[in-house]
Amino acid sequence: MSRNQLPIRSPSNPAGNREPTYIIIGEVLLFLHNNGTLPDHESIRIIYMEEKITQLPENAHRELKPGEEYQPLLSPKKNYPEVTPWSVVLGIVMTIIFSAAAAYLGLKVGQVFEAAIPIAIIAVGLSSGLKRKNALGENVMIQSIGSCSGAIVAGAIFTLPALFILQDKYPELTVNFTKVFFSSLLGGILGILFLIPFRKYFVKEQHGKYPFPEATATTQVLVSGESGGKGAKTLLISGLIGGLYDFIISTFGVWGETLSTTCFKWGAVVADKAKVLLKVNTGAAVLGLGYIVGLKYAFIICCGSFLVWLVIIPLMNLIWGGQVIDLMNTGITQTIGDMSADQIFKDYARHIGIGGIATAGIVGIVKSFGVIKSALGLAASEFSKKKSGAEAEVIRTQRDISMKIVVVGIVITLAVVFGFFALGVVDNIWHAVVGVLIVGIIAFLFTTVAANAIAIVGSNPVSGMTLMTLILASLVMVAVGLNGTAGMTAALIIGGVVCTALSVAGAFITDLKIGYWIGSTPKKQESWKFLGTLVAAATVGGVMLVLNKTYGFTGEGALVAPQANAMAAVIEPMMNGGSAPWLLYGIGAVIALVLTFFKVPALPFALGMFIPIDLNMPMLIGGAISWYVSTRSNDKELNEARMEKGTLIASGFIAGGALMGVVSAILRFAEVDMFMEPSPWTEPIAIIPYAAIIIYMAIAAIRTKK
């Protein structure tokens, strides 16, 4: 009997007889003939068994040991369904829906929700409901395409509505769909292209060094939805708790969203007289964010907040309380002493944070010079050598778009930006050249800052960096002879392109980290991100024009658009001979340099000075919970199990809160008002439910067994 005719024992043929047999070899199912022989290769029936996804590897969130490699859930040696008609079409649909919702909510209240988590939840739910097999790769692609919505919206609504606001005062200033669409589209494309050379550094080489809070939460949603079991149950329960909790706050207002020391009589007196104030956002989503960020970074961020709110603001009141200080010629008439602590923060102290972020960013750029140099060197080397099989040698999960294509793409995009500026924004070729240089230099350099911020706290300080861009652009444009309404238009379009580039770059690093953990192909994520950017830019442009005609940005009942109003308030005086708050920027710069000298991470500290304290305090509480649950035992494995359980709970809080944020936005859009009348007890009563979810998170994690 020849070797290929030997009877084969298998689960379906334990006796080794000649019955029709299926045998599993690794993960391949082979059909054998009745005589036990293998069929001809043309007729071999190979069926890939459905892979059972359980959870992320143990080393997914920690630094790797020397020689240790991270192995993603999807094997780098295999190909999986990623780009399919299902994933592309659903990704586009998600982009349109969430772009419209985020644009309305952002212009209405100034807050843009992150779409990645809700889209991941929807993708997992649909794939499970339709019983799609091995859908994890598809779901990553759906999330990656769809998440363009929040990034493009943030880039657009922070700057471009300022054009409509100024148009009301200067009728000669023109705004149309083309300006909004192209500034969003070109900025988004630049953000993607500028980030690709840094993907490996942030995603692979810095593995375990950054918490990537939003990427962690989104990945947990995708993996738990695919795996089922205890992880999915924990995520579902915590998601329901966090979602219901945040929905009650945002839709009904049963208790206050913010708990402040002013709810107590002594706190109100101290806030009025000394301008000393502490606030905590009581939302479950922000608490979960703090848990994932961890105690180290949360503490540094809060130190920045404490410096501003407990030292700088009270000192300003003490020293200049009786004076009117108008650093930007914006028409401020109140004395410092007559302002609230919130007003002092908004008009003065926050600019210190902007100066700190800009300086910390520049320091980070200098420190990252080696990374930038290697990225540029890689690009240069691809042009100097002939095409080889090098790309084929790179494993699937580390394969990017060719650096040659990236460089050519950047050059072409900047050329289109030049054409856009020359034909649709300014009348002078020289001004168009200057505009392109500003866009290219600032967007490239601050891409690393945006990615760094997202990796640390999950929050992109894009409005602060954009404000700095607007000021620099205004100074340069005035210096080359462009001012007045033409200068305002040019500076705001430049700011819109840069803002969108930084917003997309920050959001995209989250997508790429998700793909790295799961095992997606970066090249596919990068390629199809451009489609999401195109769809989101078109949607945002159309929605913004409709909202302007429906509500407007000025007058009674107008959309608030707080960031755009701030941009308009800054740029108008500068283009008409005003100035910027250089003293405050300088103070922030000095603080960042001192921190760098003492080896304290300056960027998270500066973020704390810029982000309102009510969003930073719960991060400290969440970070403290993560420290507590991961240090209670002498058993390292038990501590890790507790930490992982807490991460699932925190991810559920974030996911539930994000999803209910979308529901609340829809209700607001439909003008469904179920909000209770505010009363004196709504704020202090928030202590009870907030303490309850803190205790739930800690106890549920502590009870975990190995």
Put a short name on every predicted segment.
Residues I44-K706:
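Alpha-helical multipass membrane-protein architecture
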